[in-house]
Amino acid sequence: MSDLSGASRPKLCPGCRLREPAGESDMLLIPEGALRLAGPGRKIVERCDGQHTLDDIVRELKAEYPTAEPSRIETEVNTFLERLHQKRVIDLES
């Protein structure tokens, strides 16, 4: 079970970073290889800086995608960050 809450401040773990776009799909480089980021994945990971809370990330994405269903954004951000946490790609600060 994840420790993810609205006040959690996700931060990329050491050795994990975004690959700068070179005309291809966005990639998150991790010590074990790379993860392809789809949809708003890059925008979520960019906010995993230890400063933004989960609530901040969800609020900013709702503003950026005003036609998307708000509850879907919240669910997808939560699920995505839980997966990254399980893979030890992000730490959760409080």
Regions found by a protein language model. Give the residues of each.
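Long, low-complexity, charged/polar intrinsically disordered regions in eukaryotic proteins
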Residues: M1-E32
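Long, charge-rich, low-complexity alpha-helical segments
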Residues: A34-S94
